[in-house]
Amino acid sequence: MHPTPDALIVIDIQNDFCPGGALAVAGGDEILAPVNALLEAYQVKVLTQDWHPAGHGSFASSHPGAAPFSVTTLPYGEQVLWPDHCVIGTKGADFHPDLNTDAADLIIRKGFRAGVDSYSAFFENDHETPTGLDGYLRTRGVSRLTLVGLATDFCVQYSALDAARLGYDVTVREDACRAIDLDGSLEAARKAMRAAGVVLEG
């Protein structure tokens, strides 16, 4: 019997989330070296990529008079309205050039449906529409996941919570993540992840 493979899920290390990008996470480029090192250490390696059409419903610019980082209600619930970011075909949507994308087995693109955002690597923000990642991991025999990337309190947190809900053993390596920390969102994310049984390391 082969041991169950562990998977590394690398969340959204894209130009728009790194310094100089449209939705830059402070220190977002500082995690590239530790993430690249981790990519050498795991059997199963998945990258996620935020991938929005122009005029996406989560963009503040799609809601006349709305300010970036304000909150609105969309058909699936509350939604933070973001600056335009990770628009399909733009440099901002590309992976950071220093990320070792060649190491990945799979790239999951999310948020490409114009009417619903997708923070999680597993489900869109309606919490129902799957990305296909769960099926991929199960057919690879994976039961343990380590999550790294951007941003701790949004896409990493949502991915970790969904993974725990789906029955995976989940670890988040905080030393290989960075947070937006919008109005205390980082501490709230840590509490939610711990409550769900997610292990926070680093």
Regions flagged by a language model, labelled:
Residues V172-L186:
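Short, flexible loop segments at boundaries between secondary-structure elements
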Residues A33-R144:
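Active-site alpha/beta core segments
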Residues V199-G202:
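Short acidic-hydrophobic, aromatic-tinged amphipathic segments that line or gate anion-handling sites
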Residues G21-G28, A121-N125:
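Short glycine-enriched, charge-decorated loop/helix-capping segments at active-site entrances
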Residues V46-Q49, D169-A176:
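Short internal beta-strands
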Residues L38, V156-G167:
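Histidine-anchored nucleotide/phosphate-binding helix
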Residues V142-C155, E174-R178:
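Glycine-rich anion-binding loop/nest that anchors nucleotide
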Residues H2-L8:
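Extreme N-terminal starter segment of soluble prokaryotic enzymes
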